Swiss-Prot record:
It comes from Pyrobaculum aerophilum (strain ATCC 51768 / DSM 7523 / JCM 9630 / CIP 104966 / NBRC 100827 / IM2). GO terms for molecular function: ATP binding. ATP binds at G9, L10, P11, G12, S13, G14, K15, T16. This is UPF0200 protein PAE1629. Pfam families: AAA_17 (PF13207).
Amino acid sequence: MINVLAVAGLPGSGKTTVARIIERRGYLYYSLGDVVRAEAERRGLTPDKTAVTMRLERGRKAVIYELLKSVKPGEKVVIDGIRSIEEVEALEEFLGTVFLIYVVASRKVRYQRLTGRGRSDDPLSFSQFLLRDLRELRFGLADLLSRADYIIVNETKSIEELEQEIGKVLLELR
């Protein structure tokens, strides 16, 4: 059985929704975005600047190493917001085999979701949205698509449809 599930995808693709569904199936939930937002608050910076700064100061694995301080080997965990192959490698190094789920949705759908959720790090304009995508891709997010063990196309799926799909995936992992 695989105990470590990682969820990746561009902002607004539905990563957190997928990860929270997995959490309800008995996995402990951890968010790399929460790590960055907490560090941003501590530093008095925006989450975007903090994500870049952490990686520049301490390398591409900086955020995942911070998160790993809270995770115990052997726990069933879902990690929300993986950004690079290096982060997956760090998880594998400390926790064992990782099953990577990549969530995709169109730009239009993702932008609509982001502008409707009201988080402090959400874009205020379409140009900010595009810049955020570019930053995420520079972290190595695009490379994860070829490493994904499972891809969810989350364009118009209801929560119930996502729950059914994820339930089938988790059954196969047993």
